[in-house]
């Protein structure tokens, strides 16, 4: 029987990855297309990825595939060839290559079947996800940024927007993509005559969001081809001004790709200029927040003195304390509300 799941501990896998000498390339891709049997497709892809020593995070659903992976450089060509041959819908698929890559983005392959590759909360049977807005390439993005009739909408999370975004882009104040979709429609009701440009990290969220806006009667809708990653790459290759300011947050060990030299965020503990995210070292917290080097030393990588004290306790006592708390999303979520409560940061909406 083929091995279809990882059987090695995370610590061992991470140590193995860190000991590797061959460089790796971080790649992301997505495709909306019909997968009749997501589970069997998942199992076949898992075997293929494993044979090429690919690490990463992959989600499959009946609506398509969403992947962020790390591929040994010697296997990139073979990976591309095998992926393109796997299904006609994947032939020629755009692969977003990381802009700022240390080759240590992932250390294990996790591949899961989900209801949706992006949790959108849409249950309207008349919604056509294939009726998307028009793509914009790098030069067209810059032209739109100079168009007074264009509004750029950032379809990412608050912690992504905080460290980097396009000039004058509109942030949708919500904690999840499913909450952002109706709010984007609501916020743009008075601007139906405007040109709407939607963007996200790699294109998967803004593509669906553009279809949702069209479904709700907006006719002038665009989205950035390949998201921030492809925009920045093409702008640099073509010698164009890069109009994205700051850092592009990514969902792997790097937690960010430097796009411009500007640091537009601040340490959540002391207020110093900083755009480096980290997770609280207290295993009972793991809050995602921005922490400067000085505060990292002062608080030992924790988000508060309380967490610092708790993380210094014997492991058995830490486990005992964690056992009495709620877990899952209620503790480990990345919501703005939890961040503000934990660190005493004023809510910008208030």
From Swiss-Prot:
The active site is at residue 200. It catalyses: uridine(34) in tRNA + AH2 + O2 = 5-hydroxyuridine(34) in tRNA + A + H2O. It holds the Pfam family Rhodanese. Its EC number is 1.14.-.-. InterPro entries: Rhodanese-like_dom, Rhodanese-like_dom_sf, Rhodanese_C, TrhO, TRHO_N. Residues 316-328 have a biased composition (Basic and acidic residues). One of its GO terms (molecular function) is oxidoreductase activity, acting on paired donors, with incorporation or reduction of molecular oxygen. GO terms for biological process: tRNA modification. It comes from the Bacteria. Residues 146-240 form the Rhodanese domain. Residues 314-350 are annotated as: Disordered. It is an enzyme of class 1 (oxidoreductase). Keywords: Oxidoreductase, tRNA processing. Belongs to the TrhO family. Catalyzes oxygen-dependent 5-hydroxyuridine (ho5U) modification at position 34 in tRNAs. HAMAP family: TrhO. This is tRNA uridine(34) hydroxylase. It comes from Citrobacter koseri (strain ATCC BAA-895 / CDC 4225-83 / SGSC4696). The gene is trhO.
């Amino acid at each position: 029987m083929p091995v279809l799941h990882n059987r090695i501990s995370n610590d061992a896998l991470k140590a193995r990855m860190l000991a590797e000498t061959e460089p790796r390339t971080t790649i992301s891709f997505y495709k909306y297309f019909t997968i009749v049997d997501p589970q069997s497709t998942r199992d076949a892809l898992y075997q293929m990825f494993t044979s090429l020593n690919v690490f990463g995070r992959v989600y499959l659903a009946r609506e398509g595939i969403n992947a962020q992976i790390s591929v040994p450089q010697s296997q990139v060509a073979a990976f591309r060839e095998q992926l393109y041959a796997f299904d006609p819908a994947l032939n020629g698929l755009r692969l977003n290559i990381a802009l700022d890559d240390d080759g240590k983005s992932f250390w294990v392959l996790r591949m899961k079947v989900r209801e949706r590759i992006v949790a959108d909360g849409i249950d309207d049977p008349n919604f056509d996800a294939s009726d998307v807005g028009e793509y914009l390439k790098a030069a067209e993005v810059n032209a739109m940024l100079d168009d007074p009739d264009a509004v750029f909408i950032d379809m990412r999370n608050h912690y992504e927007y905080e460290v980097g975004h396009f000039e004058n882009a509109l942030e949708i104040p919500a904690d999840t993509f499913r909450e952002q979709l109706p709010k984007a429609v609501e916020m743009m009701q008075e601007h139906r005559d405007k040109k709407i440009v939607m963007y996200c990290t790699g294109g998967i969220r803004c593509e669906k969001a553009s279809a949702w806006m069209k479904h709700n009667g907006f006719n002038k809708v665009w989205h950035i081809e390949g998201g921030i990653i492809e925009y920045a790459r093409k702008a640099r290759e073509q010698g164009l001004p890069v109009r994205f300011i700051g850092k592009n947050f990514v969902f792997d060990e790097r937690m960010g790709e430097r796009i411009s030299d500007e640091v537009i965020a601040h340490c959540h503990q002391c207020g110093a200029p900083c755009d480096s995210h980290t997770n609280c070292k207290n295993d009972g917290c793991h809050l995602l927040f921005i922490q400067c080097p000085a505060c990292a030393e002062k608080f030992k990588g924790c988000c508060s003195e309380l967490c610092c004290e708790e993380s210094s306790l014997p492991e058995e006592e830490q486990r005992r304390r964690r056992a009495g708390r709620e877990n899952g999303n209620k503790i480990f979520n990345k919501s703005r509300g939890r961040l503000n409560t934990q660190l005493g940061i004023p809510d910008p909406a208030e």
